[in-house]
Amino acid sequence: IPSRGLGDVYKRQIYMSARKQRLLISLIAFCPALFSEIVIDGLLNEEEWTSAREINEFYEVYPYSLDTGHNDTKILIREDENGMYFGFINTQPKDTIRLNQHQRDQGVRPPIGDQNGVTLDFDNDRRTGYRFIVNAGGSIIDGVVVNENEMNDDWDGDWKQATAVQENGWTSEILIPWSIAPMKSVSTEEREIGICFYRLIISEFRVFATCRGSPYQEKFLSIFPTIKVKNY
């Protein structure tokens, strides 16, 4: 009789273990947000992007009109312990997207493909900006901006990016790790960063930015809008 009782206990433990496994599988299936993470594939289809900050106010900086009528670009922003994530949603007819590829840091002047870019002033001191650009074909450009508007593409960083083409436009996804550049230590829970996004549309040869300028204007770094991010 005692032996039989122990067997029943053992069977019950197996049953409970199997039940817990089934419950865990159900949670993963029906609550992917609890277990997912952003994969840099250009698709922007992870649950995390649904709660991202959004920016959709742009100025036309080439030609330099500062017109604010552009509404075909949306920026998504997230951050975690790995770094800062940026998603670009670019609406335009598919047959106008320029996917020409180039070697790293080439294809700037003249540009040969549609581009998304971001310049980051991590210390928000208007001294140094780090620029990261990906074109629709997946080619990249990176470098620094100093002395307000002087560009130097000799600097190369270790960052991730990907693009994807859809029927109504294209998207890009960028991860800039916190280790990409030296940053001043801050004692607060949040870090204030200067930031400017831009989009180049080759078929129209127009550039739109979230700051009122570009490196080709007299003022650039000093006119960056700022955002606050968690201080990891």
Residue locations for each model-derived region?
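Positively charged n-region of N-terminal signal peptides that target proteins for export
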Residues: 11-12, 16-22
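Single conserved hydrophobic/aromatic residue that forms the stacking wall/gate
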Residues: 1-13
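Bacterial N-terminal signal peptides
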Residues: 22-33
